[in-house]
């Protein structure tokens, strides 16, 4: 079974799903590229900036997630958009059980659908909505390290054919956005570009400690992230790459000046070599190539118990699924 990378995507606002820009074109390219090079994921676990468990981590267990229009003041057409992939309740409950064994206080939500932090990038990447989706909440009261540990507990899902995606924003200062008079194509100020480039450099240097303290110690960190909600999914995605996985910024662009639309891959993201982003109104920015990244061993952390993952199996009677224990190799 294919081992998928974990990804972090910047989702901006619901208008990304209908506006033509380098970031939307990249996500439209990325989904098919994943299918072509790695295969179709068995399921997707989304960690969105707009799902806060308010003191706990949680997982959606609905079989048919609805589309949540959790925004106001946008064009009416956005409220008519429906993105309705199937859920994966058995996998979600198995995931919750495994995370509890790892010390996470988990709740299960049978009613919640997909907020725009989930469905906006998924609709661009996988428009057919044919891959089961689970949404995992953040806990805004928990530390960056705790979210990184949550992601690390999800690392085995890669080897089970599950794609883990954190969805937030590489930079996210809405006060500057609303008061700065920025347009869609406004150039990024130095304080935005400087932080985004520093963040990418630290990720590619595998400097996890600096990344986890980015808001505190990065250049203009607190100005770029007045709150942690849109960077916490990055920490989870970074952890989900697994021990020793390389991280790389696979896309960079800016919209409305202050919003860096970076996409990061952790593990072995697909290569863009020989497969350019489809052209639209303007040429996309250059992309780095990430092909068959070597997993560089790091100093191992304290071993955790294996996460039991239950996936549907066509060989099981009644399609009930079975459990598998998997570990990622760091070599």
Task: Show where each model-derived region lies.
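Low-complexity, intrinsically disordered or signal/transmembrane-proximal segments
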Residues: 290, 320-322
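Cysteine-centered motifs
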Residues: 275, 313-316
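Long, well-ordered alpha-helical scaffolding segments within enzyme catalytic domains
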Residues: 23-31, 145-160
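Beta-strand elements within well-structured catalytic alpha/beta cores of enzymes
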Residues: 5-9, 43-49, 136, 157-170, ...
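Surface-exposed, charge/polar-rich loops and edge strands
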Residues: 97, 101, 142, 156-163, ...
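A short aromatic-anchored loop/beta-hairpin motif
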Residues: 2-102, 106
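Short, intrinsically disordered C-terminal tails of secreted or membrane-associated proteins
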Residues: 325-330
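Internal, conserved structured core segments that host functional sites
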Residues: 92-148, 153
């Amino acid at each position: 079974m294919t081992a998928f990378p974990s990804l972090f995507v910047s989702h901006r606002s619901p208008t990304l799903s209908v506006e033509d820009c380098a970031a939307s074109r990249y996500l439209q390219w990325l989904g098919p590229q994943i299918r072509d090079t790695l295969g179709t994921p068995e399921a997707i676990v989304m960690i969105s900036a707009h799902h806060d468990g308010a003191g706990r981590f949680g997982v959606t267990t609905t079989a048919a997630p609805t589309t949540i229009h959790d925004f106001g003041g946008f064009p009416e057409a956005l409220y008519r958009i429906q993105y309705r992939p199937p859920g994966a309740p058995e996998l979600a409950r198995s995931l919750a059980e495994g995370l509890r064994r790892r010390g996470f206080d988990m709740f299960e939500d049978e009613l919640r659908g997909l907020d725009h932090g989930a469905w906006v990038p998924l609709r661009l990447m996988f428009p057919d909505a044919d891959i089961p989706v689970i949404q995992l909440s953040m806990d805004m009261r928990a530390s960056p390290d705790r979210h990184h540990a949550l992601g690390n507990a999800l690392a085995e899902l890669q080897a089970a054919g599950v794609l883990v995606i954190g969805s937030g924003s590489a930079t996210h200062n809405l006060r500057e956005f609303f008061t700065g008079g920025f347009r869609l194509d406004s150039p990024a100020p130095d304080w935005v570009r400087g932080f985004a480039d520093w963040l990418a450099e630290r990720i590619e240097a595998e400097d996890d400690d600096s990344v986890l303290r980015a808001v505190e110690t990065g250049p203009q960190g607190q100005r770029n992230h007045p709150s942690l909600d849109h960077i916490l999914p990055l920490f989870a995605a970074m952890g989900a790459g697994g021990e020793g996985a390389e991280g790389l910024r696979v896309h960079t662009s800016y919209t409305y000046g202050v919003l860096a639309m970076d996409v990061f891959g952790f593990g072995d993201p697909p290569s863009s070599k020989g497969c350019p982003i489809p052209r639209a109104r303007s040429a996309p920015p250059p992309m780095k190539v990430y092909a068959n990244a070597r997993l560089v061993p790091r100093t191992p952390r304290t071993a955790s118990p294996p996460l039991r993952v239950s996936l549907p199996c066509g060989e099981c009677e009644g399609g009930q699924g079975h459990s598998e224990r998997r570990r990622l190799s760091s070599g």
